[in-house]
Amino acid sequence: MSHLIFNQPSEDKSALEDAGDFTPRFDDRGLITAIVTDAGDGELLMVAHMNAQALALTIQTGTAHYFSRSRGKIWKKGETSGNLQTVKEIRTDCDQDAIWLKVEVAGHDATCHTGRRSCFYRTVTLREGKPMLDIIDDERHFDPQDIYGK
């Protein structure tokens, strides 16, 4: 599969904001933030990062690929768990420095490595002057031990 080449972003702000060339603005580490929601119900599933190769693979294959900052490599989301993300729509923000993927999740319909549907399964609350986490979605769609051996 040929590797897409992205042109450098224009210095002209109106060129970034209008239709035409998609010229993603990667940060100084070569990454762009990807916000991922369910294409059906709009639930926020995860936030990740992409480098140019992961973004190109996502556009070309229709399957979400991301760049793992901790592992320093590209990964196809769901390759191990079976919870592949089929991309239904890709959007970018006004200055093209963030991507929004609307996806359908296969397999267990779970995105988080903890087995939950969304990585955003906790709320932050203030109790007695201290920020605390509360779990609002404890439903596990799969057992991470069975999938990842962790």
Swiss-Prot record:
The cofactors it requires, by name, are:
Mg(2+); Zn(2+)
Q: What is its EC number?
A: 3.5.4.19
Protein's cellular compartments: Cytoplasm
Q: Give the InterPro entries listed for this entry.
A: PRA-CH, PRib_AMP_CycHydrolase_dom, PRib_AMP_CycHydrolase_sf
Q: How is the cofactor bound?
A: Binds 1 Mg(2+) ion per subunit. Binds 1 zinc ion per subunit.
Q: Which residues are Mg(2+)-binding?
A: 93, 95, 97
Enzyme category, top tier: hydrolase
Where do the annotations place Zn(2+) binding?
Answer: 94, 112, 119
Keyword Hydrolase part of the UniProt annotation: yes
Q: Which pathway does UniProt place it in?
A: Amino-acid biosynthesis; L-histidine biosynthesis; L-histidine from 5-phospho-alpha-D-ribose 1-diphosphate: step 3/9
Keywords of the record? Amino-acid biosynthesis, Cytoplasm, Histidine biosynthesis, Hydrolase, Magnesium, Metal-binding, Zinc
Q: Which Gene3D superfamilies match?
A: 4.10.80.70, Phosphoribosyl-AMP cyclohydrolase
Per the record, what are the reactions this protein catalyses?
Answer: 1-(5-phospho-beta-D-ribosyl)-5'-AMP + H2O = 1-(5-phospho-beta-D-ribosyl)-5-[(5-phospho-beta-D-ribosylamino)methylideneamino]imidazole-4-carboxamide
Q: Does the keyword Cell division apply?
A: no
Oligomeric state and interaction partners are given as: Homodimer.
Family matches, as HAMAP family: HisI
What name appears for this protein in its UniProt entry? Phosphoribosyl-AMP cyclohydrolase
**Per the UniProt entry, what species is this protein from, by scientific name?**
Rhizobium etli (strain CIAT 652)
